[in-house]
Each structure stands twice: as structure tokens, then as C-alpha cells.
């Protein structure tokens, strides 16, 4: 079988529900009073959208092969990401064989090194990489998890991230991760409110249900340490992404100082094997949480996972729906997965990328079998309005 070559790359943008999951209507739990790095400023404390968390929007990347097969993926990046894909990255993709994913990744990364390395450039590279894996799966008529070496488990088990872990327990999830609401700028009163909220949720879910706190880069080491010790009596399983991603020294100190048995996790906003190498070599955390749509795509996530596995560190990818599910199913050091509760009140299970994707699987009773359909097994919704702001 001769492999087709890549004929065209297209970068599209979408507003509203999609890969930029923060781009939600008013009243959604994800835009509530949640601690962020901007919470130090009172005017940006009540709503995360007030400081522009949803400004990028969704980036959709389509890659068309010479036989007419189209692979696609979605990530965060919007118009900025579309410009990077169309005006810079496309030259490294078009004309290549669909199997040459390693070469294409390498050229995209090193060609953007002088202005990239992390952030929206890596989002764009990640999106292209995921679209290439989707395309290869469709050309070969195999699911992506088969391309990665095959499943090591038949079923995935999930914890839920959202405002209502008590409801997540009723739905069959193994645990619930709460957003932290108050940061250091709100003082001791805010710290007490954080612990009171955790205590209230513990009383609702009982002693045997996992509870975790998502701190979204909003704390400093002293505050995070106090929070961890206060939460220990309430059975907190882990404390997540307390510090800015580049504060490896702070994470290393925090991990030494938290109560024995409490896990420190981070990596959602880290990228590439080199960033995660720092986290691992400096012993910053117990679990790394790369986002496959931001860290460099599946090609890079496999390298990151191998580094972690050699050190006995778990890899629990951040959200990402099907793009992480296919990966988690193939790795022993990813024993469970995250599900983002995207219903406005976190009171029901809805697809993470709804309405952008069709056929997107969701957990039932906190569990899911990863589909065996070709590629990632999802389709773009033709009723969602997309724009192509740039061409090449």
C-alpha cells in the first residue's frame, strides 16, 4: 500500500464552546469567582473572563491527503494560532507523506524555536500533530490507540473536574476536583473560606471519595503550604498547579513541605520534554498533567510519558477528551483520566467539546470504552460556523 502525501493544510477558528473551554456564556461554573494569577487585582477577581481568559478562542486544523482523506484536530489558539499554522507551519507539512510525523514535528519545533518553545506556538504545533495522527488513523483505517501500540486496558476510569464533586460521586466518578476560589490576596479570611468549602464538600461525599483542589497557578509557596496542611485533615488527595509553571524551585520546596501522603501535581501549562524534564529532575511533583493539545501533541506526549515512567511518576493528562483518551488507554503509567464537567452547573455529563465535535464519547458511570473507529473517532459538526482568517 503506497502512502498518500499531504495536499493541503487549513487553519480555522471558532468562538463559543469548543477546544477553548473557557469561552462559555455567563453563569457557567468555570467563570465563577475562581483563584487565578490575576486575583491579586480586585477588579479581575470575580470573573476569569474579565482578564481575558477566553480571548484566544478555538483553533481547528484540517489536513487533507492526496487521496482526499481529511484529518483534523482542535486546540486553543484562535486567530493567532491560525496565522502560525498557515503562514509558517504549513510549509513543513504539505508535500510530506502522511507517515512522516516525526520529521514534521521536528521541523515545526525547531523552525519556531526563536519565538516559540511554549504557549500558543506549541498549541499550534500540538494541533497540527494531533490532526496528523487523526489523518494517519483514517488512512490506515485504525484508531489512534492502535497506532500508539494498542490498548493496555479495555476501559478508562475517570475523576471529574467541576464545581460539584458530590454530584460527580452520584454519577460514578472515582473522585472530584474542585476549583480553588480564593487566592493569597484575600488573606486569612479567604484561606478559611477555601477550607470551609472543602469541609462542606467532604461532608457531602464521605471519607472514601477522592477530593482534589485545582489552584490554577494562583498561589505562592507559603500560602500553598498552609492550604495543604489545613486541607490534610479533610483528606485532600492532591493539590494541583499551585504556582506559576516556571517556578520549579517553588514546586520542589512545596513538595517537600506538604503533609506526608498528600500529592503535589502540575504540568497543565508546561510544554515539551525539556519542560517536563525540569519538573521530574527537580522532583517537583508526584503526578504530571500535560495537556496533549498544548504540550506538543501526541508525538511529544509519548516522550514526556517515557521520561516520567522511568522515574515512577504518573501521567494523568489534563482534559483534552478523545485526544488524551486514546493515549491513556495505551499507557500503564496513566491508570485513570480526567473528565471536565462542561455542563454550566456541573450537574450532568456532556461532551467536553460540544457542540464542535460529533460522536465525542463520554463516561457512563465514571467509565468509558475508547472507541475503535478510525483516527480519533470524532467528526466536525457542520452546523458550527467556522472562519479561515488566513491562507497561504
Curated annotation (Swiss-Prot):
Swiss-Prot/TrEMBL site (Increases basicity of active site His) positions: 291
Positions annotated as active site in the UniProt record: 318
Cofactor note: Binds 1 Mg(2+) ion per subunit.
Keywords: Lyase, Magnesium, Metal-binding
Cross-referenced InterPro entries: Enolase-like_C_sf (IPR036849), Enolase-like_N (IPR029017), Enolase_C-like (IPR029065), L-Rhamnon_dehydrat (IPR023444), Mandel_Rmase/mucon_lact_enz_CS (IPR018110), Mandelate_racemase_C (IPR013342), Mandelate_racemase_N_dom (IPR013341), RHMD-like (IPR046945)
Biological role stated in the UniProt entry: Catalyzes the dehydration of L-rhamnonate to 2-keto-3-deoxy-L-rhamnonate (KDR).
Name the record gives this protein: L-rhamnonate dehydratase
Species of the source: Burkholderia ambifaria (strain ATCC BAA-244 / DSM 16087 / CCUG 44356 / LMG 19182 / AMMD)
Gene designation per UniProt: rhmD
